[in-house]
A protein has these predicted regions:
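Transmembrane beta-barrel wall of Gram-negative outer-membrane proteins
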Residues: 28-55, 64-98, 106-129, 161, ...
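Gram-negative outer-membrane beta-barrel transporters
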Residues: 362-365, 384-480
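Repeated loop/turn-to-beta-strand initiation elements of outer-membrane beta-barrel proteins
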Residues: 44-47, 85-88, 124-128, 170-173, ...
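Conserved small/polar residues in nucleotide/adenosyl-binding loops
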Residues: 529-536
Length: 538
């Protein structure tokens, strides 16, 4: 994997049943789901169609609740066996999440994904997957209180060709290539009413091409020691069809010595690029190494190092009164983020694998972490470079995971103790930097994160589930006053992310009942109760 400096979620889609038709679903208080599957041609092809939707927003007005939140998604996959060595797959996903607050604004976001994959078996030791992927991420805000709608997004056209090669029973190779064409919509504004004083505005689309070659080796060195090592080469081209501002000394942000704050620089000109022009290019090597040593048949140790590069930046100004996400490519002013991560872990199982315990500690650093000047405005800003600076970040902590894998009661308990900080120092001795150049909490810092999931099977008809989540509140920055300069009122802030939102914890329980477990396959009635939510810090 590559292209991201945070976690990657690896999802495998379930294939439909190619022999017989099945349907199952669940009806809940706040949401329901349905999944149907069956053969397209017996033992040759299959289909799977699944959908989910929530409907709590239909009942909230009955309780005088103005806030609305709901989601819906649809997932389908078609598979067909051409012959003994070739299989093809077509999958489609569409999903939306909607949240509105007191009729003031509505936030809608979601993804559309189309994926065609060809699986080819060269021999019993070599096979490949060729994938063509289209994705469309949408993010929109309806701001009725100011009279306009705003949306942004990113479309990706992705080609992947991956190989798995079993050289021997001790050496397995994975190698391949990846090429992604990105089209960014930085923002578009439309008046939401006929009486709105807002003029329509569409920012210029941005384009980029991201390429990668990689190989990875899984090597069993001894009976107890296994090594995974590899190298990924990545290349990123920021493409043209754009008009870029030119600044004195290439600085789009300047430091005001008198006020001790960062401000937007005035452009001294513009430079135009054609669609075929390369505005900026980047190249990076990303090595990775992981070692696993089995102490005995119950326990093992592991250690790893990896470097990753992320060329896309998610701009999200958490100090803004409205939520906002804008994707932007690396370029002259937004440098690629480069991650170096180290981890050491220990694993042990107990009572013939009935219980297992995992422990891991980690430390990672990120170069070129995006930071924002005070008062940064991301909505319809065609000069984003005027409100961002390149800094750095670090995160460290430990994770514990305890599982119970067998018996009437199964589940897991996870705990993470961590620290996530960032720093943006001054570019010269005359600049104070963001937050006086000191380390401060990132918006994602959560000192404590506890989650519990448990399932108890009373009998074949009845089962009970519980989910508990506890998280330290998100860091926030509050203004502590204002001052006037040349007739302009300027807010004064405390140190960045010095305060926190209330601690968040919730408990959800559900009872599942299957009326005729041996006759009615897949039918399940579900009731769920939400017991706890936010709690104010003392």
């Amino acid at each position: 994997y590559g292209g991201r400096v945070s976690s990657v979620l690896d999802i495998y889609q379930k294939e439909g049943n190619s022999n017989e038709f099945h349907a199952n679903g669940g009806i809940g208080i706040v949401s329901s789901r349905l999944l149907v599957e069956g053969p397209l041609k017996k033992e040759k092809g299959s289909f799977l169609l699944g959908g989910r939707a929530s409907y709590a927003h239909l009942f909230l007005p009955l309780f005088d609740v103005d806030n609305i939140a709901y989601f819906y998604d649809l997932n389908t996959i078609l598979s067909y066996n051409l012959n003994q060595n070739n299989n093809i797959y077509l999958s489609v996903y569409f999903g939306r999440d909607v949240f509105s607050l007191n009729d003031s604004f509505e936030n809608t976001y979601g993804n559309t994904v189309l994926n065609f994959r060809w699986n080819h078996l060269f021999s019993d030791k070599l096979f490949s997957n060729l994938s063509l992927i289209y994705s469309d991420y949408y993010y929109g805000l309806n701001l009725d209180f100011v009279g306009f709608d705003w949306n942004s997004g990113i479309r990706n056209f992705n080609l992947k060709y991956d190989f798995k090669h079993y050289l021997t029973n001790k050496i397995k190779l994975q190698y391949g290539l990846n090429s992604i064409y990105h089209k960014f919509n930085p923002g578009e504004i439309e008046p939401s009413t006929s009486t709105s004083g807002i003029n329509p505005q569409k920012l210029i689309d941005k384009y980029a091409l991201e390429n990668a070659l990689y190989f990875d080796v899984e090597h069993q060195l001894t009976d107890n020691l296994t090594a995974s090592y590899g190298l990924r080469y990545s290349n990123f081209l920021r493409l043209g069809q754009d008009e870029l501002n030119v600044y004195e000394n290439d600085q789009a942000v300047i430091f005001n010595d008198e006020l001790q704050i960062y401000e937007k620089a005035e452009p001294i000109g513009t430079e135009e690029f054609d669609r075929s022009d390369v505005i900026k290019s980047f190249n990076n090597l990303e090595p990775r190494l992981a070692l696993a040593y089995q102490l005995n048949n119950k326990s093992s140790l592991k250690a790893s190092y990896n470097r990753m590069t992320q060329y896309l930046h998610l701009l999200s100004n958490t100090s803004s009164p409205t939520p906002l996400d804008v994707w932007t490519p690396s370029g002259t002013y937004a440098k690629p983020q480069i991650l170096d991560q180290y981890a050491v872990g220990y694993f042990r199982n107990f009572s013939n694998n009935m219980y297992s315990l995992e422990f891991e500690t980690f430390y990672k650093t990120v170069q070129n972490r995006i930071d924002y000047i005070d008062g940064a405005d991301l909505i319809a800003n065609d000069a984003i470079e005027q409100v961002i600076l390149n800094g750095r970040a670090r995160a460290y902590g430990l994770e514990l995971l305890l599982r119970k894998n067998e018996g009437q009661f199964t589940g897991w308990l996870a705990y993470t103790l961590s620290k996530s900080e960032q720093q943006t120092e001054g570019r010269s001795g005359n600049e104070a930097g963001i937050n006086n150049g000191d380390w401060y909490n990132t918006p994602f810092d959560k000192t404590h994160d506890i989650s519990f999931t448990g399932s108890y099977e009373l009998n074949k008809k009845w089962s009970f589930n519980a989910n508990f989540l506890f998280q330290t509140g998100q860091p926030v920055t509050y203004p502590n006053g204002q001052y006037e300069f040349n007739g302009i009122r300027i807010p004064s802030y405390t140190n960045r992310n010095e305060f926190r939102l209330p601690t968040y914890h919730r408990l959800d329980i559900s009872a599942n009942y299957t009326p005729k477990p041996n006759k009615t396959k897949g039918f399940r009635a579900v009731s769920s109760t939400h017991l706890r939510a936010h709690e104010t810090n003392n």
